[in-house]
A protein has these predicted regions:
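Class I S-adenosyl-L-methionine-dependent methyltransferase catalytic core
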Residues: 1-145
Length: 145
């Protein structure tokens, strides 16, 4: 989703998502639009090595959501059986397509899984991080390749 971009149509941004174009009307009247520039799986990014100077990795962070859950519609859901491998592959792919000295921004919410458990899934060490959100459960983590 483009929710944290200042300019939702910024041409410098390539938004990839495994979901195709979707629109969901939530019970609170809010509409969620998922409109990736390119449908792709973060476990297999269709770009050559060192293609990007900056990458934002914002994978699903929730487990155990019903099919009708608004959070599932907005954020997606992790597979209970494969989430560790999926996130590990995602990190590998993000670092593969990131240029040397490039920046990876990783966003994670600890509702289902602690950040420390996620950071064990990559050999790369973060430079810094910042908790945010109502309960300080969302973390923005910066890596330099």
């Amino acid at each position: 989703m483009r929710s944290f971009y200042f300019n939702k149509k910024d041409e410098r941004v390539l938004f990839g998502d495994i979901r195709e174009k979707e629109t969901h009307l939530l019970t609170n009247g809010q509409t969620i639009h998922i409109e990736p520039d390119e449908v792709m799986d973060f476990r297999s990014i269709p770009y050559p090595d060192e293609s990007f100077q900056a990458v934002i990795f914002d994978p699903p962070h929730l487990l155990n959501l019903s099919e009708k859950s608004w959070m599932r519609k907005k954020y997606g859901v992790l597979d209970k059986e494969t989430w560790k491998d999926d996130i590990s592959q995602g990190f590998s792919e993000c670092f593969r397509v990131l240029k040397t000295n490039g920046t990876l921004i990783f966003k994670w919410n600890e509702t289902s899984i602690l950040l420390k458990d996620i950071l064990e899934l990559t050999n790369h060490k973060p430079l810094l991080g910042h908790p945010s959100g109502k309960r300080m459960g969302t973390h923005w983590v910066l890596f330099i390749k």
